[in-house]
Amino acid sequence: MAKETFDRSKPHVNIGTIGHVDHGKTTLTAAITKVLSKRGLAQVRDFGSIDNAPEERERGITINTSHVEYETSKRHYAHVDCPGHADYVKNMITGAAQMDGAILVVAATDGPMPQTREHILLASQVGVPNLVVFLNKVDAVDDPELVDLVEEEVRDLLKAYKFDGDNIPVIRGSALGALNGEPEWEAKVEELMDNVDEYIPLPQRLIDRDFLMPVEDTMSITGRGTVATGRIERGVINVGDPVQIIGMGAQNLNSTVTGVEMFRKLLDRGEAGDNVGLLLRGIDKEKIHRGMVICKPKSVTPHRKFKAEVYVLSKEEGGRHTPFFNKYRPQFYFRTTDVTGEVKLPAGVEMVMPGDNIALEVELINEIAMEKGLRFAIREGGRTVGAGQIIEILD
C-alpha cells in the first residue's frame, strides 16, 4: 500500500477515548496509531508511552493526560487519553483538552459500568457533541447474542443522556487483537476511524464565532481615548466595528473600536488568539476595568445565577481538607477576575466532599457576561479549590 504524506492542511479535530477503567481505552489508542502507521499516517505509540501520562496544570489543577497525534486520509487528529477516572472528570470539566467528539470504549465482556455512565453524563453536560462507540474485547465473548445485548444497553444509555443512541455508529472489535497485528481486528480499527471521520463533525473555528475579548487592563492615551487590553477569546474585530462592554454590575456600555494595536503596531483587525489593545471611542477609563468583556453587541448577556457541573479538589491535590455545605461562599474566577458567589446544593445533598464532582447552583454578588459552557475556577483566598463549567443560566 502506498504511503500517504503527512499533511498539515487537513482539517483538524480534537477527540479522546472515554469509558470505564480497564475497558481498553489506552490499548485502543495504541492500536489506532499502529494501524494508521502502516499507511504512514501516524507514529506508533506503545501502550506504556501513552499510559505514562505527563502531568499538566490547568486552572490550578493537576491533570495527567496523554496527547497522541495521528491522521486519517481525510483529517488530522489530536487524541487525548487519561490514565485515571479522576483525570477524565477534571479534564472534561476544566476543558484542559477540548474534545470535539469522543470514542466511547465499552468492553463486551462487562457491558456498561458506573464510569461508562459517568463519562456519558459528563460528555453531555460539558458539550462533547458526538460519540462513536467501540465495543471492545468481542473476541473474548463466545455468544454473539451477548454482544447484541451489550450494544442495546449502550444505545439505551446514550439515549438516556440525550445522545442519538439509535444512529450512533457502534463498531465491534478487539483493540488488543489489532495491536497484535491480527488482520481481522486491524480492519475493525480502520472501520472505527472511517466512522469517526464521517460521524464527528468538524468544529466551528473560534475565528468564525461572535467576537469576545475579556478585559485585562485599561489605560488612557492623551488625545486618543481609552485603550482596553486583553487576549481575543473568539471571533474577529475590525477598526470601525461597534462593540458592547459588559459585566461587573456596571451598565452595558456601547462603543466603536477606532484602533487595534498589537506589539505597538497599528492593525486594521485582530482575531482569536491575538493579544491586543482596542482603542474605544467615547469611553471613560474609569468606567471599564478588568473582569468586563468587550463583545459583538447583543451576543452575550450579563447574569448572576447559574447551574454548573463542578469538580472539587481533593486534599492531596491541594484542595480543601473538609467538606463544604449549603450557602458556601467562595470566589468564582471567570476569565480574568474573581467574583464572590453563594452555593446552593441540590435537594438531598447535605455536603460536598473534597474529590467529589456534582451539579450545583450559584448566585454571584455581581453580574458577569456568561453563557452556557463558560468555565471557571473556584478559589478561596487565591487558592484553587475546584473547577466548573456552566450548564444552565438561571436568571
Curated annotation (Swiss-Prot):
Annotated region described as G3, given as residue ranges: 81-84
Record keywords, A-Z: Cytoplasm, Elongation factor, GTP-binding, Hydrolase, Magnesium, Metal-binding, Nucleotide-binding, Protein biosynthesis
Residues that coordinate or bind Mg(2+): T26
Enzyme class, first EC level, given as a word: hydrolase
List of residues binding GTP: 19-26, 81-85, 136-139
Known catalytic reactions: GTP + H2O = GDP + phosphate + H(+)
Record region (G2): 60-64
GO CC terms: cytosol
EC number(s) from the headed UniProt entry: 3.6.5.3
Residue ranges of the region described as G4: 136-139
UniProt cross-references to Pfam families, sorted A to Z: GTP_EFTU (PF00009), GTP_EFTU_D2 (PF03144), GTP_EFTU_D3 (PF03143)
The keyword Aminoacyl-tRNA synthetase is assigned to this record: no
Region (G1): 19-26
Region (G5): 174-176
Subcellular localization: Cytoplasm
Record domain tr-type G: where: 10-204
Chief location: cytoplasm
Quaternary organization: Monomer.
NCBIfam families in the record: EF-Tu, PRK00049.1, PRK12735.1, PRK12736.1, small_GTP
HAMAP family: EF_Tu_B
Membership in a protein family: Belongs to the TRAFAC class translation factor GTPase superfamily. Classic translation factor GTPase family. EF-Tu/EF-1A subfamily.
Biological role: GTP hydrolase that promotes the GTP-dependent binding of aminoacyl-tRNA to the A-site of ribosomes during protein biosynthesis.
Protein's recorded name: Elongation factor Tu
Protein source organism: Amoebophilus asiaticus (strain 5a2)
Organism classification: Bacteria, Pseudomonadati, Bacteroidota, Cytophagia, Cytophagales
